[in-house]
Amino acid sequence: MRLSDYFPESSISVIHSAKDWQEAIDFSMVSLLDKNYISENYIQAIKDSTINNGPYYILAPGVAMPHARPECGALKTGMSLTLLEQGVYFPGNDEPIKLLIGLSAADADSHIGAIQALSELLCEEEILEQLLTASSEKQLADIISRG
């Protein structure tokens, strides 16, 4: 599967800002909820885990991959991509997060290919910068389609 295959239709968005990290998580997961990739419990599990464990899902400066355990309400494996034009601070993190990659992993294995492809993409500084400075959903989708 290509990386872009993990992103359901309408799962890539550019949003001006979020009032706080909880709203940023809501924005990043709503398309997966609407497409029945996750239950509402899954979103709450991410928030609860963030409060209890900190934002363990920050991947790189400005980039987070909010997710919870499969049994918390992941129904299908998929991803979303949300760019916040104005970054938001997560608890205990000094740098604002602008790019949220919502992850729903229905089991322990089905998302591994997507994570590998995404890691390769994010390791390239130029591509990461393009993601963080994109101005449209189409730009983001074009970048993801390279993975």
Curated annotation (Swiss-Prot):
Residues 5-147 form the PTS EIIA type-2 domain. One of its GO terms (cellular component) is cytoplasm. Keywords: Cytoplasm, Kinase, Phosphoprotein, Phosphotransferase system, Sugar transport, Transferase, Transport. The modification Phosphohistidine is found at residue 67. The active site is at residue 67. InterPro entries: Ascorbate-PTS_EIIA_comp, PTrfase/Anion_transptr, PTS_EIIA_type-2_dom. GO terms for biological process: phosphoenolpyruvate-dependent sugar phosphotransferase system. Pfam families: PTS_EIIA_2. It is found in: Cytoplasm. The keyword Transferase applies. One of its GO terms (molecular function) is kinase activity. The PTS EIIA type-2 domain is phosphorylated by phospho-HPr on a histidyl residue. Then, it transfers the phosphoryl group to the PTS EIIB type-2 domain. The phosphoenolpyruvate-dependent sugar phosphotransferase system (sugar PTS), a major carbohydrate active transport system, catalyzes the phosphorylation of incoming sugar substrates concomitantly with their translocation across the cell membrane. The enzyme II CmtAB PTS system is involved in D-mannitol transport. This is Mannitol-specific cryptic phosphotransferase enzyme IIA component.
